[in-house]
């Protein structure tokens, strides 16, 4: 593990391999350790970098006055790419990491040459359809609100359980995980608390359609076959708005598709990365 200094913090990252750079960006309950099935595979042909976003382990979880901001995470990604001298890079984002990656491509053009987005939870896009609005209301009621309340009360396990079950789409999913997996998720409880107490405009802003449409880099959109319908609805809107997309369904996988079916996931991404 190495750390890199940014404008007001240091971020931990790991690096392996040589060649064209690939940057992996993890989701809400994650860290740079989320991609073991990808780092070894892609480092055979690429320079692979996986980093822990601000507030996520092993980085400090919280500092007084900090806010969980999409803009800050996107700026961190751009600054990291610049500091490592790897612009323009291919960025592979899982869940909220995909939201961060797309925001970086929009607000920091020239840093990213290709995007792989695995179900970015761009919740404002759900408001564009009646079905999406219903899905958003259910997710807020069944996952976000109870997780927020539990974390505010200091019950990290209940908060993480409610959130994880919500993004998995099945109650009881968290409790079925092996103990080491549950412990790893609980390490990010502080980051989840910070995210859910942030203002919506900070951590979940609505990106204007014209800004999404102006993203000219090629984008691979991925969905898990077993993921909640909500994520497919969001990807439908991204497919409609982005000018250069390729969409694939990962069989037998849920929201954490890179972990559930790494062989298929890696093959699809490898094909996307292949020269034309």
For the regions a protein language model found, what residue spans apply to each?
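A catalytic-pocket lid/entrance helix-loop region that shapes and gates access to the active site
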Residues: 118-152
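Conserved hydrolase catalytic core segment
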Residues: 87-126, 130
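Conserved HGGG/HGGXW glycine-rich cap/lid loop of the alpha/beta-hydrolase fold
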Residues: 5-66, 80
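Conserved alpha/beta-hydrolase catalytic His-Asp/Glu region
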Residues: 152-193
